[in-house]
């Protein structure tokens, strides 16, 4: 259960509520943070292949049912995944974009939905007959999508009122001396580009959520490989690679939390957070490329070049 976690309970987000994604964006590029959170430039709603969202929805419904002792057919969860897909698509006037930013036609959309269901089925099948994900038992998840918040303890140096806040995907147990949390990811099926314990060790999210728990934390990432069931020309494969979920794990301790607080302190100071960003001086952290202003994954390249490009 989420014992020991302070719940936000729908509380309004404030400037001094810092999520892992907010801190991570600033860490990668303060200019991107500035456009997003200070200038509040909103891009037109686009849905880029919401397969991951659909899979998450199916799995979340499954885990919530398991914790309540409810059993349903696989088709029910496939339907929940499709409903989540439809909700995402409604936000962009029914248009879904592929990985290259091109609008998808109805056949491509139907194929993408089928692929998302195939990935979910891999997770569902792995749990049958008492199965686990490399020793991690999703049946142990007690709560999903927990909106947690904690005021930052700056230590003897002190600091301004600041909170860490985030939606913890899966809470397993927070009552013992070591909290147990987890998160579901979909990933490249090539393990070279997928996940490992080393990649899990580098995740800011795991540190932030461990800090929310207020104690050492074992954090598991459960990975669903995005195996393709259609060829490049759109033909369904006769024998697609089976989806076999796997596990990447890491532990967070006081050492990690100390470094996390140091990063937070730098963030608060650099952004002038508690003075409504008045003295924030952002700069672009460009990734060099021969084909444009910057090769980072970012929604603000046009604005960035116009503002910082001279």
Model regions and ranges:
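Long, acidic, intrinsically disordered low-complexity segments
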Residues: 1-18
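Metal-dependent nuclease catalytic regions and adjoining charged, substrate-binding loops involved
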Residues: 17-18, 116, 198-199, 210-310
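Nuclease catalytic cores
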Residues: 23-24, 28-67, 121, 145, ...
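Active-site-adjacent bridging/hinge elements
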Residues: 29-35, 178-185, 269-273
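A non-catalytic, helix-rich entry segment at domain boundaries
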Residues: 58-152
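Non-catalytic protein-protein interaction segments used by genome-maintenance enzymes to assemble
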Residues: 138, 143-206, 212
């Amino acid at each position: 259960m989420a014992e020991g976690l302070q719940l936000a309970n729908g509380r309004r987000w404030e400037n001094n509520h810092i999520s892992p994604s907010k801190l991570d964006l600033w860490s990668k590029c303060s200019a991107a943070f500035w456009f997003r959170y200070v200038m509040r430039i909103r891009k037109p709603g686009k849905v880029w292949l919401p397969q991951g969202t659909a899979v998450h929805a199916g799995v979340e419904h499954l885990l919530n049912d398991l914790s309540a002792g409810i059993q349903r057919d696989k088709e029910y969860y496939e339907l929940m995944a499709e409903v989540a897909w439809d909700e995402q698509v409604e936000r962009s006037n029914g248009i879904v974009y592929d990985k290259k930013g091109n609008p998808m036609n109805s056949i491509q959309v139907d194929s993408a939905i089928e692929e998302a269901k195939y990935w979910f089925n891999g997770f569902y099948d792995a749990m049958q007959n008492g199965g686990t994900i490399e020793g991690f038992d999703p049946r142990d998840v007690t709560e999903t999508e927990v909106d947690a918040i904690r005021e930052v303890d700056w230590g003897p140096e002190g600091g301004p009122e600041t909170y860490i806040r985030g939606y913890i995907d899966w809470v397993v147990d927070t009552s013992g001396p070591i909290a147990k949390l987890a998160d579901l990811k979909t990933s490249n099926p090539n393990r070279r580009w997928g996940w490992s314990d080393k990649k899990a060790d580098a995740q800011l999210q795991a540190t932030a959520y461990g800090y929310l728990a207020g104690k050492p934390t074992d954090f598991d990432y459960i990975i669903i490989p995005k195996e393709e069931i259609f060829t490049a020309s759109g033909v369904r494969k006769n024998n697609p690679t089976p989806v076999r979920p796997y596990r990447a794990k890491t532990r967070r301790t006081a050492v990690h939390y100390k470094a996390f607080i140091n990063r937070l302190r730098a963030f608060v100071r650099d952004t002038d957070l508690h003075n409504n960003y008045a003295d924030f001086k952002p700069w672009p952290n460009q990734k060099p490329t021969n084909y444009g202003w910057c090769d980072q994954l970012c929604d603000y390249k046009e604005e960035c070049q116009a503002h910082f490009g001279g």
